[in-house]
Amino acid sequence: NEVDIVGALNADLTQFL
């Protein structure tokens, strides 16, 4: 799902912040 991809990207981005 697109939602799964967005969720994974958001999780990855929060690791950089």
Curated annotation (Swiss-Prot):
Protein name: Unknown protein 6
Naturally occurring in which organism (per UniProt): Pseudotsuga menziesii (Douglas-fir)
Domain of life: Eukaryota
